[in-house]
């Protein structure tokens, strides 16, 4: 399972590539991760204002809300240039103009949620 240092390294690695970029599309190849992935089409055209971490969750803040990503036991995020073909365990692409943020999760224990409002009010982050 990615521990806090790995999650922070992931955040720091993806932030310069996607902060300030507009999400043009997303493609969910495998809806059955830890919980079903259901992203609203309304996030297309929204800009990623910030990339943060709360515990082991990565937060992609947008004007209408926040994408909350957990890498599970074996998940990873990577920046993919152009239209690189997905591998077997690439379950989600968040597409921007010139690149994609790709979630790879062989064991499918990761999760991706969209939450309107502040992420601290989402049931996964609420204390």
Question: Where is each model-derived feature located?
Answer:
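Extended, highly charged segments
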Residues: 1-62, 95-97
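Phosphate/anion-contacting hairpin/loop surfaces
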Residues: 67-127
